[in-house]
Amino acid sequence: MKTKLNKIANDTNIFLKKFLNKQNNSKLLPAMKYGLFPGGKKIRSKILIDIGSLLAIDYKTLIAIGAAVECIHAYSLIHDDLPCMDNDKIRRGKPSTHIKFGESTAVLAGNSLLTMAFEILASSSLQISEKIKINLIKRLSECSGHLGIAGGQYLDLSYEKKKISKNKIIEMEIKKTGKLFSFCCAAPAIIKKKNTKEIKFFENIGSDIGLLFQIADDLIDFKVSSKIAGKKTGKDQKKGKATLISLLGYMNAIQYCDKIILKTNKNLKRYGSNSKNIKETLNYILHRKK
């Protein structure tokens, strides 16, 4: 699993570095690169490639789309770490972007990575039809704004120190994390020109995977040391964050994750042994330490 993730991370970073090298030089590039590289585990890109391989989508096309997704993810982390948001000083084992470059530069670098994602999807390096590009851009923009990441982060902040129902926590976590995974699962189906029902099928799988990822992330915050995780842990409890762990308890949250994995594997049964990569990724998501 590590070898597969490392290859995807390496190929994605090569694509992003080449793309950035073609950009006109600007004072924001160092902060953008700092927030983007070396980057995380590229699990979103791995899910995209797992689903893409089920539908026989070209690997280079998937890497380009994954690079756009990683720009969105990096933007969201830079902004989440800001003092006005989660106020995290460490990210991926190094000082957060705003600690290194200052708050205003971090905000602008995050904004620039957000818009660069759409540049990538619109670029000639992505060998798909203009109609499909427009569809992907529309869907990725929805995942990133008030209907997705930004809206989910707003709810996350507003739910602190409040008693929130299970359904509302799930809605928040799907917006905050699940929407981007939904895009990763739906994009290959869109490229393959699948019908609306089939695209929705993959979107729903993505929502479930995103929820699994968020619960697993909360489990790391609950139990793993900051040194191993590469970020400050134990903060959710201190801030009174609304999570499924705080509502259901540690063991019940793990059981909930197991149910998501069983459901996803059942839904992908039609692809037989071809779905073994995604099964492996789901188990990795739940059992990772950072």
Predicted regions and their residues:
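Mg2+-dependent prenyl diphosphate-binding active-site environment of isoprenoid biosynthetic enzymes
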Residues: 4, 11, 17-268, 276-286
